[in-house]
Amino acid sequence: MARSITVVTTFSDAGWEQYGKRFVETFVQYWPKDIKLKIYCDSVQPGYPEVEWIKLNAACPDLVTFKERHKYNEHAHGVRPDGKKKSYLWDAVKFAHKSYCVSHAALNSTTDLIIWLDADVVTHSPVPFEFIESLLPQNHYCAYLGREKIYPECGFVVYDTKSEYNKIFMQDWQALYNTDSLFEEVEYHDSYLFWQLVKKHSANGMQTTNLSKGHPHRPGVHVFINSPLGEYMDHLKGKRKKDGRSKPTDIYYKRDADYWKKL
């Protein structure tokens, strides 16, 4: 029997205008109708009955508390512990939104699987249900885009919400923020914290799947579009949002989709 699936993401009102609207429209156009879409948001956007809109602050009060607690803490907003420069690697507040959304969705899921999908992803080709479900083998808790000697690319992660590891994994993730213990880590962003949690729970028997296996996954390589996901989606990381698509130099594998032929 096929497993039920919900895709989860979040964006602000400003993010809706910049990339969120395109995310939703291409999702509705190309994803299977029996895969649900849940969006944690500031404001509900009218005209999209296919979407379950969740008011972020109401659903995640601990996020509101965390942000208020660190409102004036520059180290929680990207300034390195040594104070020398600012970087996303230490922007705990920015990436807390994603962490709280993932954990809330996973702990309150009504479907077998949830998929975190960054809102700056564009779907360019029809996505087969069977392809999506096949990404996470039975008895594996999560599937993600691994990279060598560096934190994973977490723009796409599949979680089995029925797994025995789901509750403890997500509660541990929330606890990093609720207790401020994330500031004891080398980096503070969601991908690094996810990486540490995967290593911790894998040591206790949790099984995972690396979707980048057999594909380029070195630091600096656009691992998302060079994985099997690239056949159906583009991830507009960083400055690619302004361009509206990835660059030809990002591609390491021949792609058959018309979308990539137009680069």
Regions found by a protein language model. Give the residues of each.
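N-proximal low-complexity "stem/linker" segments adjacent to membrane-targeting elements
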Residues: 1-21
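Residues at the starts of beta-strands that form the adenosine-phosphate
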Residues: 4, 34-36
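Short, acidic, metal-binding catalytic loop of nucleotide-sugar glycosyltransferases
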Residues: 26-34
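Short, polar loop motifs at secondary-structure junctions
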Residues: 39-46
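Active-site-proximal specificity loops/subdomain of glycosyltransferases
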Residues: 46-108
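GT-A fold catalytic core of metal-dependent nucleotide-sugar glycosyltransferases
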Residues: 94-143
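Conserved catalytic core of nucleotide-sugar-dependent glycosyltransferases
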Residues: 124-188
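Catalytic core and acceptor-binding pocket of nucleotide-sugar-dependent glycosyltransferases
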Residues: 163-263
